[in-house]
């Protein structure tokens, strides 16, 4: 059995879609993949992911009967993940290596290299689901998520995500209005004891 530190398992999972590293992390966190999957389903319910049911921790669905989700639910999960900014230390890696350079990693999310502001997030491909992607990008103070499910090819999923993100950045922005404090008058409050 080969030893690998948690940081490298996270990197292998986020960058290279290493299912063995994903299972090892699940077992480390929860004791078993089954318990981890149960925790994932509980968390999905807490996040309002009404169309999601996990059967494993990898996303592989060839033998899974009811491993399902929706684009909306993936966006909810992605938004929650982005609250933990340190994840971007892994999801923005283009190329890296493990085991002292013996194992090379190239990010399965090609947008990391080719799309300005990409912060991640994750690709997935199975025969049932097709080529999928949760793409996240930030420009100025605007952070967007584009989810593509069921694409026929990897290239098409990236093109669809780029189109959605470009549209979002062209049409939306986070704006904080500047208000002159002197323009706001005094307010008198009366407290009534009942």
Region spans (language model):
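Active-site-adjacent helix/loop patches that line small-molecule binding or acyl-intermediate pockets
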Residues: 7-96
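Short charge-dense sequence patches
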Residues: 1, 22-32, 108-119
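Short, small-residue-biased leader/transition segments that mark boundaries at the very start
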Residues: 2-6, 194
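Domain-terminus/edge residues, biased toward the C-terminal soluble/receptor-binding domains
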Residues: 49, 53, 65-192
């Amino acid at each position: 059995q080969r030893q690998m530190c948690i940081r490298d398992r996270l990197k292998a999972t986020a960058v290279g879609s290493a299912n063995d590293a994903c299972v090892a992390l699940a077992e480390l966190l929860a004791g078993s993949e089954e318990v981890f999957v149960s925790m994932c389903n509980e968390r999905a319910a807490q996040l309002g992911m009404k169309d999601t049911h996990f059967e494993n921790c990898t996303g592989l669905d060839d033998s899974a009967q009811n491993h399902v989700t929706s684009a909306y639910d993936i966006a909810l999960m992605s938004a929650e993940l982005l609250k933990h900014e340190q994840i971007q230390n892994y999801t923005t890696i283009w190329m890296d290596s493990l085991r002292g350079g013996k194992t090379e990693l190239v990010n399965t999310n090609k947008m990391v290299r080719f799309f300005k502001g990409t912060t991640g997030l994750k690709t997935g491909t199975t025969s049932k689901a097709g080529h999928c992607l949760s793409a996240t990008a930030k420009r100025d103070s605007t952070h967007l998520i584009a989810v593509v499910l069921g694409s026929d090819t990897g290239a098409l999923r990236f093109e669809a995500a780029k189109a959605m993100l470009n549209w979002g950045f062209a049409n939306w922005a986070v704006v904080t209005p500047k208000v002159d404090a002197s323009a706001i008058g005094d307010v008198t409050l009366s407290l009534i004891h009942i």
